[in-house]
A protein has these predicted regions:
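Conserved ABC ATPase signature
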Residues: 148-152, 156
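Short helical segment in ABC ATPase nucleotide-binding domains corresponding to the A-loop/adjacent helical element
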Residues: 110-119, 129, 133, 237
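A short, proline-enriched helix->beta-strand linker immediately N-terminal to the Walker B motif
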Residues: 167-171
Length: 273
């Protein structure tokens, strides 16, 4: 496969990366096949970045996220956090999924945010409770701390999941298409709330999406991936541009051009009678 990677200059690239994915090949087995999800993928995420993995289905975005989380090991290459190889899951990498059922249904909103802190014994219970309440305040859910998940809307459930993850103060927040199951209006609202939350706390996030507008809005770095197996197609700066207007629209067009260059070339190569 001909991969024409376009690499943009990274702000702060002279500093050591927080997360390094070094020529990583990932494979997994199905009943019929051994699937190569990614092939020699490499990128670096620096502290405080909003780094987006963007590509179509089959490019290994979610598989990469699982590997960063420590749920699977590369067959080639290495993934390092703060210079140390990732061998297993840890509380320094917290995940937010797109499914609404990621919350514990028998616990209240506060109980869900509090639960991983108590399991990890990060602080005394009373201190952890105040910390959990502070995170709920950041996602505007203080009034719902005693409510159970089945009483919440999809967007509210995702806010709880984000608060629960950030309450652990992870080195990297891993988000696997967290807003994909929401309606368009709620999705945009959640995107804006995530950006505001980032402005308040400057956490590091690795965000997976197949939506070009979402990538342009959320990311300040965007890694473009091609499928079957997943490979790096390019890497661009975004810095939260509006995907509709000005530089954001131009960036969206450039991303589309890079991601679908092979398809355009194939169409142009077909003789027309």
């Amino acid at each position: 496969m001909n991969v024409n990677a376009e690499i943009a200059g990274r702000p702060g690239a002279m500093t050591a990366p927080l997360l390094a994915v070094d020529n990583v090949t990932l494979q997994y087995k199905t009943e019929q096949h051994l699937v190569t999800a990614t092939y020699r993928v490499g990128f670096e995420v620096h502290e405080g970045e909003r780094f987006v993995l963007l590509g179509p289905s089959g490019c290994g975005k979610s598989t990469l996220l699982k590997a960063v989380a420590g749920f699977m090991q590369p067959v080639e290459g290495e993934i390092r956090l703060s210079g140390k190889p990732i061998r297993q899951p840890g509380s320094d990498r917290m995940m937010v999924f797109q499914e609404f059922d990621q919350l514990l249904p028998w616990k209240t909103v506060l109980g869900n945010v509090l639960f991983p802190q108590l399991v990890n014994k990060r602080m005394p219970k009373d201190q952890a409770t105040e910390h959990a309440r502070a995170m709920l305040a950041k996602v505007n859910l203080s009034r719902f701390e005693n409510v159970f998940p089945h009483m919440l809307s999809g967007g509210m459930k995702q806010r709880v999941a984000i608060a629960r993850a950030l309450a652990m103060e992870p080195a990297v927040l891993l988000m696997d298409e967290p807003f994909a199951a929401l309606d368009a209006l709620t999705r945009r609202k959640m995107q804006e709330e995530l950006l505001q939350l980032w402005e308040d706390t400057r956490f590091t996030v690795l965000f997976v999406t197949h939506s070009i507008p979402e990538a342009v809005l959320i990311g300040n770095r965007i890694l473009l991936m091609s499928p079957h197996p997943g490979q790096v197609k390019g890497e661009l700066n975004s810095d939260g541009s509006d995907p509709v207007d000005g530089t954001g629209a131009k960036l969206s067009d450039r991303i589309h051009e890079i991601l679908f260059a092979d398809r355009i070339e194939e169409q142009e190569a077909v003789p027309h009678g």
